[in-house]
A protein has these predicted regions:
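Short, surface-exposed linear motifs at loops/turns and structural transition points
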Residues: 34, 187-287
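Catalytic zinc-binding patch centered on the HExxH motif and its immediate surroundings
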Residues: 327-350
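Short pre-active-site segment immediately N-terminal to the catalytic Zn-binding motif
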Residues: 349-363
Length: 462
């Protein structure tokens, strides 16, 4: 059971517990804030479970399970559901508490698994319905689209299918439908789609990249970036529409291979499937990093340990994606007397009890100290890299180039700088290296962008 929660008030949820255990919690759906607060939590007994209640609840679960049996699902889930239904049907008023709990737990588990499988088949059916709705035998390449529709329909009837097989067929059907629409594209009305700017600077990681482009046009259906290991990629190759907005649009490519040459092109497509492409840009992804981590599980409660552990893991994932560093180990330790967090050169880190600092942004920042920011002589005592030897403008080219790319500002007023301990961009929108919990926007772009700047610092000699 669930109760919808909107504003601060008293809320309750009622349930019948036949298994001896229950999980109670909150699910945030389309939340605009970043926290949930629960106060004055009370667990109350409404009444004892009688044999009539047991039989009624079990019969309800049996009916729910049987209603699912008419729908398409994987063979294993169908068999498990049938077994669980038969087990539940054997429950009587004289059944032991253990037998009731076992039967109810089994059928609940089987129902949940069946619903997941049914949803996956329904997604395939929706893709089939969409393709059939746009199919026209009189149009170009209609035979190719129908061939893929037929394959999908056969899979829809196959209980031996797998989730991977269904997911792949949905992708194949969507690609066939796109190819069909492209083969029958018309100019449409209004201003024709056009890529007006392709930024030749691309921030690359091991499997990801950040790309800037500007497009125009009327009735735009989709804009993004496509890529391939071959020249002149199209929207029928790999493509993404995921983007960030910061003084323009930054598209975010994922799913590439490390140490690989790729060709990318921005594109814009209108609602009648006319596509315009920008200039091709060649990129080479980095080798993946080889950083590792550990957490000493020293926090006083599970929640704090989980926050710290996750922040450290995510930080090392960012470092391995964007920096290529190998041989660095981040050793995370709980510091009960540490007001915020700190890290020495080489990766010995302490995280204190303040939950605001048990976060990815803080750990990314402190790990920067672990690899040289503010802790190595190239940073704090080098006239080749610092305008004032230990502070001021960073004199390396790469860090400022990526900073200007992120801000989309290419004048002399935009450069990377810092003091003897920390670094930041001049006139920055974000504090890219997260110099304080209050500077943490909890933004993927801020984190990835900061790592791109970090990589630039390494290229410059740090």
């Amino acid at each position: 059971n669930e109760t919808t929660v909107y504003t601060p008030a008293n809320y309750s949820v009622k349930f019948t517990n036949l298994t001896g255990k229950a999980t109670i919690g909150f699910e945030a759906v389309d939340a605009t804030g970043n926290w949930l607060a629960v106060d004055n939590f009370r667990l109350g007994l409404i009444g004892e479970i009688t044999s009539d209640i047991i039989i009624s609840e079990v019969q309800r679960l049996v009916s729910e399970g049987e209603s699912l049996q008419t729908q398409m699902m994987y063979k294993a889930e169908a068999q498990n559901l049938a077994t669980a239904i038969e087990q539940a049907k054997k429950i009587t008023a004289t059944s032991t508490e253990a037998d009731v709990a076992s039967a109810v737990e089994a059928i609940n588990k089987a129902i949940k698994a069946a619903m997941v499988a049914i949803t996956e088949y329904q997604a395939l059916q929706s893709a089939i319905d969409n393709a059939q709705g746009q199919y026209d035998v009189a149009k170009n390449d209609a035979d190719k689209l129908m061939e893929e529709i037929n394959k999908a329909q056969e899979l829809m009837k196959n209980a031996e299918a797998t989730k991977t097989g269904i997911d792949n067929e949905i992708i194949a059907l969507e690609k066939a439908l796109l190819a069909f629409n492209l083969a029958n594209a018309t100019p449409g009305s209004g201003t024709a789609p056009k890529v007006t700017l392709t930024n030749k600077y691309v921030a690359t990681g091991a499997t990801q990249a950040l790309v800037r482009t500007t497009v125009t046009g009327s009735n735009i259906l989709e804009r993004g970036v496509c890529w391939s290991t071959e020249h002149n990629p199209t929207v029928l190759d790999n493509r993404t529409t995921k983007s960030f907005s910061l003084n323009g649009t930054i598209f975010h490519i994922k799913g590439m291979k490390p140490s690989t040459v790729y060709y990318i092109r921005p594109y814009v497509m209108n609602k009648t499937y006319t596509v315009a492409y920008g200039d091709e840009v060649k990129i080479v992804t980095h080798p993946a990093g080889g950083c590792t981590w550990s957490w000493n599980e020293g926090a006083p409660d599970d929640a704090a340990n989980t926050r710290c552990r996750n922040a450290i893991k995510e930080t090392i994932d960012y470092f391995n994606e964007w920096t290529g560093i190998k041989g660095f180990h981040l050793t995370g330790n709980y510091g009960s007397g540490t007001p915020t967090a700190d890290c020495s050169y080489g990766g010995w880190m302490r995280i204190g009890p303040n939950a605001a600092y048990q976060a990815i942004g803080t750990v990314l920042h402190e790990t920067g100290h672990g690899v040289g920011v503010g802790t190595h002589w190239i940073w704090n005592n080098c006239s080749d890299t610092r305008q004032n030897t230990s502070s001021g403008k960073w004199l390396g080219r790469a860090a400022t180039e990526v900073y200007q790319f992120l801000e989309n500002k290419y004048t002399d007023d935009y450069y990377f700088q810092g003091d003897k301990t920390h670094g930041w961009g001049r006139n920055a929108t974000y504090d890219w290296l997260v110099n304080g919990a209050d500077k943490d926007k909890h933004s993927e772009l801020q984190y990835a962008g900061g790592m791109c700047i970090m990589y630039g610092l390494f290229l410059d000699g740090l």
